[in-house]
Regions:
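Alpha-helical transmembrane segments of polytopic integral membrane proteins
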Residues: 29, 58-61, 90, 94, ...
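Helix-loop-helix module between adjacent transmembrane segments
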Residues: 18, 52-53, 73-170, 225-233, ...
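Flexible loop linkers connecting adjacent transmembrane helices
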Residues: 24-42, 63-81, 88-117, 263-277
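Loop-to-helix junctions at membrane interfaces in multi-pass transport proteins
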Residues: 2-3, 40, 63-77, 184-355
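Hydrophobic alpha-helical transmembrane segments of polytopic
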Residues: 7-14, 46, 121, 159, ...
Length: 355
C-alpha cells in the first residue's frame, strides 16, 4: 500500500494534533496532585472516556475484529463478568481509595502492611505494564512498517518517543485528553471500515446477507456453554462460564489493582463521580465490544467474496520474495488463490440460496 498526500496529511495532523491538544489541556498540572491526578477535578463522563481510552489501542483495532474473523463472536462472553466486577469495585474499592486520598493503589498496601509490600507490587505493575505497553506500541509500528516499509526498530522508537513526549510533559490530564481523542478516532475508523466493507460487497449482497453468511459459517456464536455430547469441554476458552467467572475476577484485578485504571477514576471530582464512571464502563463496554467483534464478522463476509492477501505485511512479503523461499511462497500463494476462488463460489451460492 502506497501512502498518498491525503494519507500523510491525516497521519501527521492526527499525531501532532493529539500531542499538542494533550499538552495544552495539561497546563494546569503545576503540582504533584495536578500532575498525577489532574487535581481530582474530572467529571464522570471524562473519567469514563479516559478509562475506555486506556483499554482501546491499536491492539483493539487490529486484534478484536481478527478474533471474530477467525473464531466468531464468542469472545464477547469474556466481558460478561465486567459489569458485576464494576458493581463490587464501586461498593468496596472506590470509597476506600477516596477516603484515604491515595495517589496509587499500591500506596494503600504500604499503609496496610509496609513499604516493602508497596515496592514489590509497584515493581510487578511496572514490569507487566512495560511489557503490555511495548506490545501496544509495537502494533501501530508494525502497521506503519507494513504499509511504508519503515525499519521496524526505528518505527518503534518513533512511536514510543511520541508517547513519552506528552506523557512526561503533560501528566495525567494530558494522558486523559489524548486517550479520549484516540478513543474517538479508533472507533470512528473501525465503523468507517465496517461501512466500507458492507458497501464494497457484490451487488445484491447487503448487510443482512453478510450476517447470514457469517452466521452460517459459525461466526455469530455469541453464547456458548462449553457443553458437548461427551460432556463439558474444559479446553473451550470462551464460554458463558469462563466469561462470567474468569471475566469477573480478571476485571476485578484489572480495575481494582492496576494503576493504569485506578489512576483514571482517582482523577474524578468525588467518590460519586468515580462510581458512576465505573458503572457506566460496565454498562457500555459489553455492547461496544459486541459491535467491534461484529466488524470482524463483516470482514469475514467481505473476504468471502474478495481475495484476501496471503500475507498482509507487504514489507516482509518482499523480503520473502527476495529470499530462497520465493519459489515455495509463490506455489503456496497460487494454491491459496484457488481456495479463495472456491470460497467465493460457495459464498455466492449461499447468498443466492438465502434470497
Amino acid at each position: 500500500m502506497n501512502f498518498q498526500a491525503a494519507d500523510w496529511i491525516v497521519l501527521v495532523i492526527t499525531l501532532l494534533g493529539v500531542i499538542a491538544f494533550g499538552i495544552y489541556k495539561s497546563s494546569t498540572s503545576r503540582n504533584l496532585e495536578g500532575y498525577f491526578l489532574s487535581n481530582r477535578q474530572m467529571p464522570w463522563w471524562m473519567v469514563l472516556l479516559s478509562i475506555m481510552g486506556t483499554q482501546a489501542s491499536a491492539i483493539t483495532f487490529l486484534t478484536a475484529p481478527g478474533q471474530a474473523y477467525t473464531d466468531g463472536m464468542r469472545f464477547v462472553q469474556y466481558y460478561f463478568g465486567l459489569p458485576l466486577a464494576m458493581i463490587v469495585l464501586a461498593i468496596t474499592f472506590v470509597p476506600l481509595f477516596h477516603r484515604l486520598k491515595l495517589f496509587t493503589a499500591y500506596e494503600f498496601l504500604e499503609q496496610r502492611f509496609d513499604g516493602k509490600t508497596r515496592m514489590l507490587t509497584s515493581f510487578l505493575f511496572l514490569l507487566s505494564r512495560g511489557l503490555s505497553t511495548g506490545i501496544s506500541v509495537f502494533a501501530p509500528s508494525l502497521v506503519l512498517h507494513s504499509m511504508l516499509g519503515w525499519d521496524i526498530y526505528w518505527t518503534n522508537i518513533f512511536m514510543g518517543g511520541l508517547l513519552i513526549i506528552y506523557t512526561v510533559t503533560g501528566g495525567a490530564k494530558a494522558v486523559a485528553y489524548t486517550q479520549q481523542l484516540q478513543f474517538v478516532i479508533i472507533y470512528i475508523a473501525m465503523f468507517i471500515a465496517a461501512y466500507y466493507a458492507v458497501q464494497s460487497l457484490p451487488e445484491g449482497v447487503g448487510f443482512t446477507d453478510a450476517l447470514h453468511i457469517a452466521g452460517k459459517s459459525g461466526k455469530l456464536n455469541v453464547i456458548t456453554t462449553g457443553q458437548t455430547e461427551l460432556g463439558f469441554d474444559w479446553k473451550d476458552r470462551y464460554n458463558i462460564w469462563s466469561g462470567l467467572i474468569g471475566g469477573f475476577f480478571l476485571a476485578l484485578s484489572y480495575f481494582g489493582t492496576d494503576q493504569s485504571q485506578v489512576g483514571r477514576y482517582l482523577t474524578a471530582k468525588d467518590e460519586k463521580q468515580s462510581r458512576v464512571s465505573l458503572l457506566m464502563n460496565g454498562l457500555v463496554k459489553v455492547p461496544l465490544q459486541f459491535l467491534i467483534l461484529l466488524i470482524g464478522c463483516l470482514l469475514f463476509a467481505y473476504y468471502s467474496f474478495f481475495k484476501a492477501p496471503a500475507f498482509f505485511n507487504q514489507a516482509q512479503e518482499q523480503q520473502v520474495l527476495a529470499s530462497t523461499y520465493a519459489t515455495e511462497y509463490r506455489e503456496e500463494t497460487a494454491a491459496f488463490t484457488q481456495l479463495q476462488s472456491r470460497k467465493k463460489e460457495l459464498a455466492t451460492a449461499l447468498s443466492s440460496a438465502l434470497k
